[in-house]
Swiss-Prot record:
This is Unknown protein 1. It comes from Pseudotsuga menziesii.
Length: 14
């Protein structure tokens, strides 16, 4: 549920 809100800087850093 948080992957769509912070997918821009969350998937790139983690």
């Amino acid at each position: 549920a948080r992957a769509r809100l912070g997918v821009r800087r969350f998937r790139r850093k983690r």
